[in-house]
Amino acid sequence: MLKKEWDYVNKILKKIKNIRNLLQDESMYVIIVYDVNVSRVNKIKSFLRKHLNWVQNSVFEGEVTKAEFERIKDGILRIIDEDEDSVIIYQFPLNFMPKREILGLEKNPIDDII
């Protein structure tokens, strides 16, 4: 009887691991850096604040799902003028978190995030 229970627990653990792997595949860490016309700065900043953490002027970062990432890209494209503005997006898998080192003043310390 104990063997059957152990096998059952192992099957459940395997399913949980598969679900976790699927969820990780659906998520990523992004850093977005933008240089847009002054007339669009507040609009793009307000939009990105809804989805990511503000780091400093023109820089946002955070963990998002693939679906959220696509919504963010679509929102950015609706705001910017592609002939005049520039947005750079760095994507990282969740199992590879970039190391961040701050030189000088930290504009938005992580412990300020509620």
Swiss-Prot record:
Its cofactor is Mg(2+). CRISPR (clustered regularly interspaced short palindromic repeat), is an adaptive immune system that provides protection against mobile genetic elements (viruses, transposable elements and conjugative plasmids). CRISPR clusters contain sequences complementary to antecedent mobile elements and target invading nucleic acids. CRISPR clusters are transcribed and processed into CRISPR RNA (crRNA). Functions as a ssRNA-specific endoribonuclease. Involved in the integration of spacer DNA into the CRISPR cassette. One of its GO terms (biological process) is defense response to virus. The gene is cas2. Its EC number is 3.1.-.-. Belongs to the CRISPR-associated endoribonuclease Cas2 protein family. NCBIfam families: cas2. The keyword Hydrolase applies. This is CRISPR-associated endoribonuclease Cas2. It comes from Methanocaldococcus jannaschii (strain ATCC 43067 / DSM 2661 / JAL-1 / JCM 10045 / NBRC 100440) (Methanococcus jannaschii). One of its GO terms (molecular function) is metal ion binding. SUPFAM superfamilies: TTP0101/SSO1404-like (SSF143430).
